[in-house]
From Swiss-Prot:
Substrate binds at S45, T66, Y258. HAMAP family: PdxB (MF_01825). It comes from the Bacteria. CDD domains: ErythrP_dh (cd12158). Pathway: Cofactor biosynthesis; pyridoxine 5'-phosphate biosynthesis; pyridoxine 5'-phosphate from D-erythrose 4-phosphate: step 2/5. This is Erythronate-4-phosphate dehydrogenase. GO terms for biological process: 'de novo' pyridoxal 5'-phosphate biosynthetic process; pyridoxine biosynthetic process.
Length: 378
């Protein structure tokens, strides 16, 4: 059995070698010759999986180690009798922590408290729900918009997108990319929406680049609209609008979900799905794969305020470490993908063990996802 895996999927070689011969290949572009005798293909979001790639090939299963699936033609795979699995929710925690790192940086720079802001969350799936929970644990008001879930009658106080635009100080997008249909998200943030945002609002896109109309956004920024922008995703990736990058406050190369834990979850989820597909079901405990974190433990004295939270968050991950490298190489062919391929190891908040002498601080940090304990001061 021959299994092709994206060379940037951590732990893929070790795990899939339990099931057969493993060949690591680049994800963009996939070397088509390798598909001629392969049984399975494991990809990330950079690989377009469709009829033109796989027609006439012996591939029996495709796995994507990503939550999103808009790079995969699922209908064609089903028609062709090819098994498929994604990794829903694998990087949701990472994306939430990316948003927090960005917001805490902007709050410190611009001198505001997040408690004084209302956050509108567009898309309330794996990422949106977790973001809502952490924001509300901090006492920050949220507004939710998710028409598909609202129409299904899912639990939640869902509001219209127009209401979020009118009321939210921060608008953050966490939707799939639907190019048509009743829940179309292509250019969901169009010129009309962008112009309607509150003065001084913060716009965040960490889902799919085309959810925000990049040309319209640049037009509004060039005309002097008072707007802070955080973009992790771009229309036309791996190409991007370099002028737009110079105008946004934070710009990163589609790495919001790139924690080691998130990548490992993606790999293990598709590994488990494929092992079940071939009748050799196996389960993997994530903590058996991950290395010890860089920071063992720290001690926190007193209550948890916003400056202290910012220091803890940025100790684990400061979004500026990914903003600066992109600005240096933007516009140079191939560099966007190189930044992703050679991405520095990044951990999640749970990797940081925090000893608190304040019980409420320990409790709150645990709700936020840190590994915190209460040890009273002596």
């Amino acid at each position: 059995m021959k299994i092709l895996v994206d060379e940037n999927m951590p732990y893929a070689r070790d795990l899939f070698s339990r099931l057969g011969e493993v060949i690591a290949v680049p994800g963009r572009p996939i070397p088509v010759a390798q598909l001629a005798d392969a049984d399975a293909l494991m990809v990330r979001s950079v690989t377009k999986v469709n009829e033109s790639l796989l027609a006439g090939k012996p591939i029996k299963f495709v796995g994507t180690a990503t939550a999103g699936t808009d790079h995969v033609d699922e209908a064609w795979l089903k028609q062709a009798g090819i098994g498929f699995s994604a990794a829903p929710g694998c990087n949701a925690i990472a994306v939430v922590e990316y948003v927090f790192s960005s917001l805490l940086m902007l709050a410190e720079r611009d001198g505001f408290s997040l408690h004084d802001r209302t956050v509108g969350i567009v898309g309330v799936g794996n990422v949106g729900r977790r973001l809502q929970a952490r924001l509300e644990a901090l006492g920050i008001k949220t507004l939710l918009c998710d028409p598909p879930r609202a129409d299904r009658g899912d639990e939640g106080d869902f509001r219209s997108l127009d209401e979020l635009v009118q009321r939210a100080d921060i608008l953050t997008f966490h939707t799939p990319l639907f190019k048509d249909g009743p829940y179309k998200t292509l250019h969901l943030a169009d010129e009309k929406l962008i112009r309607s945002l509150k003065p001084g609002a913060i716009l965040i896109n960490a889902c799919r680049g085309a959810v925000v109309d990049n040309t319209a956004l640049l037009t509004c920024l060039n005309e002097g609209q008072k707007l802070s922008v955080v973009l992790d995703v771009w229309e036309g990736e791996p190409e991007l609008n370099v002028e737009l990058l110079t105008k946004v406050d934070i710009g990163t190369p589609h790495i919001a979900g790139y924690t080691l834990e998130g990548k490992a979850r993606g790999t293990t989820q598709v590994f488990e799905a494929y092992s079940k597909f071939i009748g050799h079901e196996q389960h993997v405990a994530l903590d058996t794969l991950l290395p010890a974190p860089e920071f063992g433990r720290i001690t926190l004295h007193g209550p948890l305020d916003q400056p202290t939270l910012k220091r803890l968050v940025h100790l684990v991950y400061d979004v500026r470490r990914d903003d600066a490298p992109l600005r240096k190489v933007a516009g140079i062919p191939g560099e966007f993908d190189k930044l992703r391929k050679n991405y520095l190891e990044r951990r999640e908040w749970s990797s940081l063990y925090v000893i608190c002498d304040d019980a409420s601080a320990a409790s709150l940090l645990c709700k936020l996802g840190f590994n915190a304990v209460h040890h009273p001061a002596r």
